[in-house]
Amino acid sequence: MKLFLDGILVVEGKEDASYLSNYVASEIVVVNGFEIPDTTISYLKGKQIILLLDPDEAGQEIRKKLNSLLPNSINVEIDINKCTRGFKKGVAECEIDEILHKLKIYAVNKNKIDSDIKQSDLYQLDLIGNRELRKKVCDKLNLGNCNGKTLYRRLLNNNISLEQLCEIIK
């Protein structure tokens, strides 16, 4: 069973998100290293944030930047010596047991998603394939930049109902 966290897990790159999504059911936001978009910061403000960044020097610099922008963030740090897969020393190279052990204290018993939106609804509402409409919805809900898949996940994680979504589109 996947771990559901009481907050949004923030990681550096897509490889980290892909690796962790096999074990964590919560929303995972990728900050793309030092190039953290303002829309991502805006989306994360006011939410429970769990920072899980690479234990290298670059990861520490990104952590420092995010902590200054999002001061109530929870910092989860992995021992660099536990990252033994391959030559890189990032979250995606760490042993999953070590990561889950560190994240377990932020876990909740069940998934809190109450949204009634299905992915097929996004197709019917023309949110998949219509970048302008998707951007309008994302801007109104302060969801940051989203492709169709990310929009779906963020709507679910923010418990946006189908009725609310239809009202925004009108």
Predicted feature residues:
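Short, Lys/Arg-enriched, disordered terminal segments
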Residues: 1-4, 170
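Acidic, glycine-rich catalytic loops of TOPRIM or P-loop NTPase phosphate-binding modules used
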Residues: 4-48
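TOPRIM fold recognition
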Residues: 22, 34-170
